[in-house]
Every structure is written in structure tokens, then in C-alpha cells.
Amino acid sequence: MNQQYSAMRSNVSMLGKLLGDTIKEALGEEILDKVESIRKLSKSSRAGNEVQRQKLLLTLQNLSNDELLPVARAFNQFLNLTNVAEQYHSISPHGEAASNPVALAKLIERLKDKNFTNQQLKQAVEQISIELVLTAHPTEIARRTLIHKLVEVNTCLSQLDHDDLADYERTNIMRRLRQLVAQSWHTDEIRKIRPTPIDEAKWGFAVVENSLWEGVPAFLREFNEQLEESIDYNLPVEASPIRFTSWMGGDRDGNPNVTAEITRHALLLSRWKAADLFLNDIQVLVSELSMTESTPELRELAGGADVAEPYREIAKQLRTRLQVTRDYLEQRIKGQQSLPPEGLLIDNSALWEPLYACYQSLHQCGMRIIANGQLLDTLRRIRCFGLQLVRLDIRQESTNHTEALSELTQYLELGDYASWSEEQKQTFLLTELNSKRPLIPTHWQPSEATKEVFETCRVIAESPKDSIASYVISMAKVPSDVLAVKLLLKEAGADIRLPVAPLFETLEDLNNAESVMTRLFDIPWYRDLIDNKQMVMIGYSDSAKDAGVMAASWAQYRAQDALIKLCEKSGVTLTLFHGRGGTIGRGGAPAHAALLSQPPGSLKGGLRVTEQGEMIRFKFGLPQVTISSLAHYAGAILEANLLPPPEPKTAWIEVMDALSDVSCEMYRGYVRGEKDFVPYFRAATPEGELGKLPLGSRPAKRRPTGGVETLRAIPWIFAWTQNRLMLPAWLGAGAALQHEIDNGKQAVLDDMCENWPFFNTRIAMLEMVYAKADLWLAEYYDQRLVEENLWPLGAKLRQQLSDDIKSVLAISKDEHLMADLPWVAESIALRNVYTDPLNVLQAELLQRSRTHSESDPRIEQALMVTIAGIAAGMRNTG
């Protein structure tokens, strides 16, 4: 165990020393001494030395305005480098995640031990479907420029791990590391301007190019080797167990910056990047496929019997077509309208078929080893990414559709659609969906907002098939919300069979999800249309903000379970789409635990889940990390489908119902019922200041005024993470558990913890939150920033947190938090030494900026750096 971490710790101290050298060179010995003294005080403070803690507070309070920024930056950079060392450790020969792909092989052995036949395992493998949806919010807080440097630091750490390095090689690698650390130090870590949705889309494409492009075929190769070895099975070349979709440039819910034109632009960029990446692949194949022997069919395809190198000839033809495609898309991106040229690649089959013919011919001519090299990787990329690179989801809030149709029906003098009953709406929508004539008059001039809704549907209609993955309706409440989108698509000339996924996200909507879908399935026209396939999205963040984490997670479980049973009864294949974030308050949990804690049967229709902002970098930032993450997902799906978790016992359900009610009542009692809560929240956290951070393209609020309910879920969680109270991720949960213990339910809770992955994961997640929360820091924020009349509320919340930790330990039977996950505990402990000074500094900066009438750019800049640094320290933003 300790040896496992010693490699990581030595990398952390080496990178820390390089950073120290850089700071000394840039700012002199004095600043470095100050930083080093703060780090040592922080370490002693963490070890419980109260005298040193007071000294730490005084040192940071007495920094001059000129010293603030260098000190904040030093600790922020320490944390970035620590995260790199940790990410590298997870894939290094020393790290436990080095065994992830091996873990997959072990799982297959475990399944065989449980008497699953090779045939059953083969069927389960064939059903694996992983669709990861890349989203920008809460958006990666680190700049793309810095991320590239940190990725290269990772590469250097990997090179240093080779035992057989010559001295000069080691010297060169260390020199490069020094350069990268210095470059990072001299690069501004905070963006000066807010990214546009197109910037975000490009960030997504960069992840594909830098990591997924290599990582996906590499994972499939490893997975295939394990399957071959363990169950004598090869993944079919045409299998596409992994797909990527993006919300960047398609998610317009609450983001007025995402227009139809932006979506059109993002789709073109995506196709351009795909053509560019495939062109590189084909270029390699042109040089590799010099073989002459082929089947007669392939020779015919290459241009006849006279062609000496048929494989190369086919690759060259594709190269020409990809160049034509890339050039055409480049013109379109620049706004030049031109007719589609001859040879333009639109359909994946035009790229797939010639290359697959090469693959078959090589196999038939005894050149399997060549076929299974670069060519197989390219074929797998066509299946995973295709000519679209990533498909796009469109997301819009239901009220926008209602208002657009309302404007139309009033113009047509049919009445006001928005004021009709649900029955009237359905009658109107179904009549129009079955009508042969268009509904929209040619010369109608709607309002800008309505025009935008219709124009978005036109973009869908004009895009190549397979460019758009689904249309997600947020705040879906009734069947007409789904039918309305179908009608809008029909009127735009789009394919109305495009999956339309209602998103159920508040507590009430989750509780009503089954009834809404039942009514939808009862409509014969709808049942005929969907071909027995339905996608439903479950929202995690808004329900947690609405009702607290315990009530929300139970409502999510109940909704999923009810939908699974409804679809089984109705003969519909259900794909549940999980809108999770990286934080607990937004449904975050390690992938394996999260998937196994879902209701039985929830993964039969495949896994579709959002991967957000900074989590994309942690899980998919490097090809090796991608292999590891995909192995996690594949293993969890196999396990969940073959060894499903148990159906909850009646006693468990009763306890969960009680936990949900008690926790929701307590959560809402504070958040909505406590008159001082909102002023306390605004004073004790940097919520107001967060709005200034040029983070994502999306505004932080749905409406510019109002209380907690108008805040987006992400800033709400982000703000509480900053002051280390982590309130949204625990409030109500521990108190509800204690309530049930007091009601004599300890034995039932023990049974649930032991035998029910759903409950066990809830407890583990609470432990992780408690391990990251910090009472003394939260209290320090109160003392520096909150008016004295609000102190009792803060004290009450901290006491609640303290009591809750005891309640959870009574259930987990552990002596201390995270006893089962020493790796995570180690990781939190390692970062706390660097995060604590940033928290103290942030409270100091907030106090200075709020008491000074004029803004000081030094204070503002340092404040932004502490926000970024604490986010890196907590390893999640929102």
C-alpha cells in the first residue's frame, strides 16, 4: 500500500521542487520562502497543531496586495501538478488502475465461476452499448492552453518510469519537465474572456483528437484480446460498443448564446475535424498497404486487373475524397456557399465499405496480421466516430416549444395553444402530425424566439443523417411536450423518428415520469412511430437542488425502476440517459459504483451518460486513461446485466421512503424556510464573485434576480464547494439516517448497507463528501465574511454536519471516513495541504474586495486564481 503511494508522492515532491525553482527564478528567494513557510504551516495545521494554524491564518491575513497573486498562483499550480501526478499514478505500473483492463479479465473469470457459459458471456458482450455525451458545463475551469502542457508533463513522468534510461535521456526529460513547469507558471491560468459555444465545441473536438482517437481502438484491441483468451470470441469488426455525442453547440437550455446558426457551425466544424483526422489515418494506410496479392473482388474495386497495388489504390481514392470533403467543409465554415462537389463524403458507408473490402481481402489472402493493424483501428474509428466525429444532441426547455406553438396557433386564429388543456393539446398535435398539409404559412413573420425554435429544427432537417443523436426536452412534464417536438420536426422537414427524450429533473417530475410515459405509450400513433424504442433522461442536479441529495437519489431510483418495469410490460426497449455531473450533488460517483447502484435492468438498453467539463479531462484526458475508464464502464455494464443488484425488499423501501421524506423536509426547511438562509449563502460563499469568472458560455442564473431556485444547479454546488461546507451534497441525509436509527431501524440499515448497492453507494458518497468538507475552514469563512447576526445559522449547519458524520459512521461501521477507499483518502490528504491556504486566502480576498469601494485588479485576479485552485483541489467544480 505505502509503496504504491510512495511513487506518486515522490513525483509530487519532484514537481513541487521544479515549481519552487521556477518561482525563485521568476520572483526571487523571498516569495519562495514565504510560499514554503505557508506550505509547512498548512501541513502542521492539518496534523492538528492549533498554534501553527493560527500562525497560518495570520501569515495569510498579513500578505500585502502585491503578494496575494504570487502566493495564490503558487498553490494553484501545486494542485494542478499534484492532479497530474495522481492521474499518471492511476495508469502507471505502480498505480492500482494499471489493473483496470486486467480487472475486466478478472470479471470475466468471476462470471465463468458463476457458471455463465461462453455463449451467455458472448451475448452479454454483444449487448454492451456505451454512449458518452460530452458536455461543457460546468465547464473545465482550467484553460485549454494549460491542459496541453499538463498532458505533456504526464508524458514525461511516464518516460521517467523506464528503468533502462541512459543518463543523457533522463537529463533531457528533466529539462523538458522544467520547461513545461516554467511555461505553466508564466501562462495566465484564468481566461480573460468567456468562451463561446463554438470554443466549447472545439474543446470537445480536441479531447477526441488528443485522446479518444487513440484510446478507443486501443481499448477495443485490449478488450478483444481478453475475450479471445477467456471465451474464445472476437469482437466483430463492425461492432460499435462505444459512441460519443456532444452537447457543445447543441444545448440551448438556458443558454441564449446557442442559436441555430451556432449549431449549424458546430456541426460543420465537427465534420471538418473528422475529415481531417481520417485523412491522417488514410495517409498512413497509403504508405502501409503496399501488398499486391488480393481477391479478384478487391482488384475489381481498385480499378481492374492492371492495378499493381490494389489496397494502396483504394486508400488513395479515399484520400482524394477526404481532401475534397475537407476543402468543401472549410469553405462552408468560412460562410462561402458552394454546390457539393463530386466525391463528397457524407455517408459513413462510403468510407467504411472500401476499407472493409480491403480488410476482408487481406484476411482471405493470409495477411490477418496486417489487416488487424492500422486498418482495423481505422475501421473501428469509423464505427465509433464516423464522418460526424461526434453526434450532436439538441436540448431545449419545453416552455420554448409551447410558446412557439402558441404564437403560431394565435396567428392562425385557432386560439392560444398555451392555455389549452392537455387533452386539447394532444388532439391538435396528433391531428397536425397526421395531416398532409403544412401548418406554417409561408409569409408568417414570427418573433425572434419562435423563429429560433423553428430554425433549429431546420438545421436538424438539413444535417446529414446520423449527425443528430437525439432531441432532449428539459423540464418535460406532460405527453404533449414530446408530441410538440415531433410536430416541430415534421414542419421543418426533419425525420420525426429522431429520438426525442423527455428529461425529468425536479422531484415532482421524477415522481410523475411513469405516468407521463404510460400516457404517451397509450397513443397508438406514437407507439407505431417509435418502433418500440424510447430514450428518457433522468436529471440529477436539479432534483438534488430542489429536494436535497437523499430525496433526489431515491426519486431517481424509483423513477428509473418504474420506467424499466413499464417498458418491459409494454415491450419497449428503454435507454435511460443519465444527466450526471462530477459532484455528489449532481449524481457523481465512481462509474462502477454508480452503475451497479441503479435498479436491476437499467442497463439492458445500453448506457448513455453525460461526461462533464473537468470530469472529461480526469477520465479521458490521455489515451491510457481512456482505456482505463472504458474498461470500468464495460465491466460495470457486464456485471450489472449478468449479476443484477437485488430488487429492494419491502423493509428497505419503507426505510428509503422515510429517509426521503425526513431529509427533504429538513433540506427545504433550511433552504426555503430559513429566512436568513439566502443572505447567509451569499455572504459565506463566493457565489456573487463566481459570476465574474469567464467559465462557460452559459449564464449562471436562469433569471437575473431571485433566490436559490433561480440559480443553476452548477453555481449552487460550486459555491458551497469553495467554502468547504459542501452543503448541497449532504444536507438532510445524515439527519434522516439518525432519525431512522432512533426509530429502531439500525438492523434494516445494516442489511441495506451490506446487501444493496444503491444504498451502499449513497453511504460511500456521503463519506467522500464529509472527507472533503472542513468545519474549521467553513467557520473561518463565517468569521471573516458573515455578519454576526447570521453566525448562529452557520454554527447550526456545522453542528449538523458534525452529527451527520457520526450517524454515517454508525452505519458504515468504520472508525474513520473513507476506511474502505484508502486511495481516495490518501488523495484528499495529499491535496488538503495545498488547498487549505487557498481557502484561507480566498476568505481574506473576499473580505478585502467586499470592504473596498474600488475594485483592485490584484485582488480580483488573485480571487479568480483561488477559485480555480480550490476547484482543482476538490477535483470537481459543479
Swiss-Prot record:
Kindly list the GO molecular function terms attached to this UniProt entry: magnesium ion binding; phosphoenolpyruvate carboxylase activity
What UniProt keywords apply to this chain's record, in alphabetical order?
Answer: Carbon dioxide fixation, Lyase, Magnesium
One Pfam family for this entry, by name?
PEPcase
Which InterPro entries does the record cross-reference, listed alphabetically? Answer: PEP_COase (IPR021135), PEP_COase_bac/pln-type (IPR022805), PEP_COase_Lys_AS (IPR018129), PEPCASE_His_AS (IPR033129), Pyrv/PenolPyrv_kinase-like_dom (IPR015813)
SUPFAM superfamilies of this UniProt entry? Phosphoenolpyruvate/pyruvate domain
- Name the residues annotated as catalytic in the UniProt entry: H137, K545
Protein function: Forms oxaloacetate, a four-carbon dicarboxylic acid source for the tricarboxylic acid cycle.
Record's protein name? Phosphoenolpyruvate carboxylase
